[in-house]
A protein has these predicted regions:
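Paired small-residue
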Residues: 89-96, 104-112, 309-317
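Helix-loop-helix hairpin linking two adjacent transmembrane segments in secondary transporters
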Residues: 105, 134, 142-187
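A late C-terminal transmembrane helix in Major Facilitator Superfamily
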Residues: 332-370, 378
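Cytoplasmic helix-loop-helix junction between adjacent transmembrane helices
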Residues: 103, 109-150
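Conserved MFS/SLC helix-loop-helix module at the cytosolic interface between two early adjacent transmembrane helices
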Residues: 64-104
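Helix-breaking motifs and short loop linkers at transmembrane-helix boundaries and internal kinks
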Residues: 44-46, 78, 99-105, 116, ...
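C-terminal transmembrane helical hairpin of 12-TM major facilitator-type secondary transporters
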Residues: 283-329
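Juxtamembrane intracellular "pre-TM" segments in multi-pass secondary transporters
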Residues: 2-10, 192-222
Length: 404
């Protein structure tokens, strides 16, 4: 890969990709690592499941807000200082989460942590747009997405081991340490956006640049269509521990193995994308993704209650489709934006995160069983995605889609 613009004298290419990858891992690290602890946290705080799950829902909603604020600000003040602020917020909030004795203060600190994570995620995509272009950007996106699978594979396993030898509080201390390491690397990062490329005006003017990107209806329509895939996956994430531990009666360590297998399968999405991206038309790709998704959701509704193995087998195809969508759609969307990269990245990640948060809320509702809830969420959100996709095919963007 060849970087464009300012070279990274200290981080080099490998260090830059490592920093981008780890900061982009903020969502799975911040949720998956303490998934095995959720039942124990509910017992510790004496709180209902829906209240404890608010620690995740609040995180994702505030992360979406952080994206919308910090992403555009990076177009005005630069990537480096904005990333430093994001990491400081995340690190300090993680420490406060670790020492709190109140579930409501924990939710509050998760909000602060989410804002910092929002900046980390949106800036990781913006830096890729700054430093890579053409086929190398497609490869970089796929590499980062593939490497990010390490987080959901390792995080629940690490989390399960932590609660065996310590408590859930240690999980948040670990997150703070990861943020501290990224912060140290960020001080070595050389600014990737030149002074003459930055937006002018104040903070409000910078945030208003979101409207410039958002008013592109064709851009936002395609973004919405692919973002609907995030909702069912996040619904699964929110209740996976309850499905495996409460419904199927597995131990936390066994749950972490099942969870890791599903996460490991997700790595094949970006890998397949790297192999076939230049050979398979985007339009055909989308139709295949829809077929896989609907087949997975319907199979889960029909057979997913039978055993944890069958439930996992119905979830894996959707997880692979969801992991393919991200680099596939991100590369298409970034190609359409000239300037306002931070705003575009923020809007892109915000839409995925907002719909993911909605999916988490819907998945956490008191279904007759969470297995049915996940299956219904998959089918329902894919129907919405299909409706928007049909609109995209009838819009001016059909020429762009057909050309890919």
């Amino acid at each position: 890969m060849q970087t464009e613009g300012i070279q990274q004298k200290y981080l080099r290419k490998a260090g830059l990709l490592a920093l981008i990858t780890v900061t982009g891992m903020a969502p799975p690290l911040s949720t998956d690592m303490y998934l095995p602890s959720l039942p124990k946290m509910a017992d510790y705080f004496g709180a209902a499941t829906v209240v404890v799950n608010m620690t995740m829902v609040a995180f994702f909603i505030s992360m979406a807000v952080g994206m919308l604020v910090l992403g555009p600000l990076s177009d005005r003040f630069g990537r480096k200082i904005t990333l430093i602020v994001s990491l400081l917020l995340y690190m300090l909030a993680s420490v406060m989460c670790a020492v709190t004795a109140s579930i409501y203060f924990l939710i509050l600190m998760r909000i602060v942590q989410g804002i910092g994570a929002g900046g980390m995620v949106s800036l990781s995509i913006a830096i890729i747009k700054d430093c890579f272009e053409g086929p190398t950007r497609a490869t970089a996106l796929a590499v980062v997405q593939s490497m990010s699978v390490i987080a959901p594979i390792a995080a629940p396993v690490i989390g399960a081991l932590i609660i065996q030898v310590s408590t859930w509080r240690t999980v948040f201390f670990v997150l703070a340490a990861i943020a501290a390491a990224c912060l140290a690397a960020t001080f070595l990062f050389e600014e990737s956006i030149h002074e003459d490329e930055r937006n002018e005006g104040g903070i409000i003017d910078s945030i208003k640049r979101l409207g410039v990107v958002g008013r592109n209806v064709n851009f936002t329509s395609f973004l919405l269509a692919v973002s609907f895939f995030s909702a069912p996956f996040m619904a699964y994430l929110a209740v996976a521990s309850y499905v495996y531990e409460d419904f199927f009666g597995l131990k936390p360590t066994t749950f972490s193995i099942f969870f890791a297998i599903n996460a490991l399968s997700s790595i094949f999405g970006p890998l397949i994308y790297m192999r076939i991206n230049s050979r398979v038309p985007a339009k055909a790709t989308m139709w295949v993704l829809f077929i896989i998704g609907f087949a997975a959701g319907i199979s889960m509704l029909l057979f997913g209650h039978a055993s944890p193995v069958i439930f996992l087998a119905t979830m894996i195809p959707f997880s692979m489709a969801n992991s393919y969508v991200r680099p596939f759609s991100t590369n298409i969307l970034l190609d359409q934006i000239q300037g306002d990269t931070g705003s575009a990245s923020a809007l892109l990640n915000f839409t995925h995160t907002l719909l993911g948060s909605i999916g988490m809320f819907i998945g956490s509702l008191p279904w007759s069983s969470y297995v049915s809830g996940i299956g219904i969420t998959i089918v329902g959100f894919l129907l919405l995605a299909l409706a928007v996709w049909v609109y995209v095919l009838k819009s001016r963007w059909r020429y762009m889609i057909n050309a890919r």
